A protein has these predicted regions:
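Conserved "landmark" site that anchors the functional core of diverse proteins
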Residues: 1-183
Length: 183
């Protein structure tokens, strides 16, 4: 049986660059935050102002639990029941990942990667693109809080994320070149 301090011999590395690979790591990414309650940022949806005042306050001030019925189509949020000021008669309209719909029960649904192409519920908000990976990492039973941002802030966050990913790509490409693994 293996014991603490045992050393295991390894066969010659199949790829010579593996022997030369230095230890390195990346800092945790802010969009994969693992804090117990993550704040997800939203843009106002076309029907945000149709929410009554108490519902707008609750949407942005109360925590929401990710429901066990969540999947890759939509993430169901459980929290205070949200209500419209008056009923809306809507025709189906295009939706995208991150669209926050409000079905009749008052519990919002954030559309995810395998969302339908159209939806007929009020579109009260839209999760910004930068926070969509964070939503995808949340599990049923975890909580999220929601906050509104302006479009210019959402765009600045998207640009910052894109720049960070470009730097990572360049760094990995350079390291692979240095290690001779692109040959």
């Amino acid at each position: 049986a293996l014991q603490a301090g045992d050393r295991l011999p390894l066969a010659e590395a199949a790829r010579p660059w593996l022997r030369r690979a230095p230890d390195w790591s990346l800092a945790p990414w802010p969009w994969f935050d693992v804090s117990p309650t993550r704040v997800l940022r939203l843009l106002r949806g076309s029907h945000f102002d149709a929410l009554d005042a108490a519902s707008r306050t609750a949407l942005l001030g109360e925590p929401f639990l990710i429901a066990s019925e969540s999947n890759r189509v939509g993430v169901r949020l459980l929290g205070p029941a949200l209500q419209l000021s008056a009923p809306l008669e809507l025709v189906s309209a295009a939706v995208t990942p991150g669209t926050v719909q409000l079905p009749p029960g008052g519990q919002p649904i954030m559309l995810a990667a395998e969302h339908p192409t159209t939806g007929g519920y009020p579109r009260i908000a839209h999760l910004i693109a930068t926070d969509q990976p964070q939503l995808a990492q949340r599990r049923p039973g975890e909580t999220v809080r929601l906050a509104l941002v302006e479009p210019d802030e959402a765009e600045a966050l998207r640009r910052r994320q894109a720049a960070a990913l470009a730097r990572l790509h360049d760094y990995v490409k350079q390291r692979r070149r240095e290690l001779g693994c692109d040959a």
